[in-house]
UniProtKB/Swiss-Prot annotation:
Gene from which this protein is expressed: rps17e
Keywords for this protein: Ribonucleoprotein, Ribosomal protein
Molecular function terms from GO: structural constituent of ribosome
BP GO annotations: translation
Organism: Halorubrum lacusprofundi (strain ATCC 49239 / DSM 5036 / JCM 8891 / ACAM 34)
Keyword Cytoplasm: no
NCBIfam families, per database record: PRK01151.1 (NF002242)
Cellular component GO terms held in the UniProt record: ribonucleoprotein complex; ribosome
HAMAP family in alphabetical order: Ribosomal_eS17
Pfam families, per the entry: Ribosomal_S17e
Official protein name in the record: Small ribosomal subunit protein eS17
């Protein structure tokens, strides 16, 4: 698994901190949330952010 770039992690963490209820463990809904909450125009960057957020939510759910 590749290491995510710093800007993906930073933006993903900011989104999780500000809007924790907008995200869950489903990639498709997280993709829509990233689209509505940010101004990211690139589909690839949007998907990477959504994937990172999905991964973080899944890890948090496993620990709980």
């Amino acid at each position: 698994m590749a290491i995510k770039p710093k800007y993906i992690k930073q933006l993903g963490n900011v989104l999780l901190e500000r809007y924790p209820d907008s995200f869950n463990t489903d990639f498709e809904t997280n993709k829509d949330s990233v689209t509505t909450l940010t101004t990211v125009e690139s589909k690839g960057v949007r998907n990477r952010i959504a994937g990172y957020v999905t991964q973080k939510k899944a890890q948090a759910a496993q620990k709980a």
